[in-house]
Regions:
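N-terminal leader segment of winged-helix/HTH proteins
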Residues: 1-48
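Charged, amphipathic alpha-helical coiled-coil/dimerization segments
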Residues: 2-14, 38, 88-151
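Hydrophobic/aromatic-rich alpha-helical bundle segments in the mid-to-C-terminal region
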Residues: 18-20, 131-141, 161-169
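Flexible interhelical turns and helix-capping residues at alpha-helix boundaries
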Residues: 34, 65, 76, 80, ...
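N-terminal helix-turn-helix DNA-binding core of bacterial DNA-binding proteins
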Residues: 39-82, 93
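Exposed, interaction-prone assembly regions rather than primary DNA-binding/catalytic cores
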Residues: 144-170
């Protein structure tokens, strides 16, 4: 029994205080995990001369069809100029459609086209495969703990935006 508790403590379970070395290892693990998480979509996007900004835009337009450019700016945390460059290419390539708002003609609402949905599906399928494998290997308790850690790392505004997106059920 004592051995089980020692190995649990070493793995980070039930620790209230982490050493700088344990924190550094967590930071490095996130860097490498992020590289793995983005590697598959990066390969798909590179064939189209797109980058991660295109991926994020397509992802969040898919999650909230009809979202406004301003809402997407808030979610992505990028400059208007940067987002406009990305949206221009996605619209020109027939992946995103921009419609003028009915209530406010100054607003532009964004929707994925059929081709945009196909790209989003391909990108998210690649990431779901990786996430599913990792979650299965880690187990349900680790999955719940991982999600809590990620949510705890978000600033309040980000956590609120994430909560709204999560609660939208799309």
């Amino acid at each position: 029994m004592a051995d089980g508790r020692a190995s649990s403590a070493q793995s980070g379970e039930n620790l209230l205080f982490l050493t700088d070395e344990q924190l550094r290892q967590g930071i490095e693990a996130m860097f490498f995990a992020y590289r793995g998480f983005t590697a598959d979509p990066d390969r798909i996007l590179s064939d189209m001369a797109y980058g991660r900004a295109h991926h994020r835009a397509v992802h969040f337009i898919n999650r909230a069809p009809g979202t406004t450019v301003n809402n997407l700016l808030n979610i992505l945390g990028v400059t208007k100029q940067s987002l406009n460059r990305v949206l221009r290419t996605l619209i020109e390539d027939g992946l995103v459609e921009s419609k003028v708002g009915k209530a406010d003609k100054r607003e532009r609402h964004l929707f994925l086209t059929e081709e945009g949905h196909a790209l989003e599906q391909k990108l998210s399928d690649a990431q779901r495969v990786r996430m599913r494998m990792a979650y299965r290997e880690a187990g349900p308790d680790a999955v719940a703990g991982f999600r809590r850690v990620l949510e705890a790392m978000m600033d309040r505004e980000m956590r609120n935006a994430y909560g709204r997106l999560k609660d939208s059920g799309t």
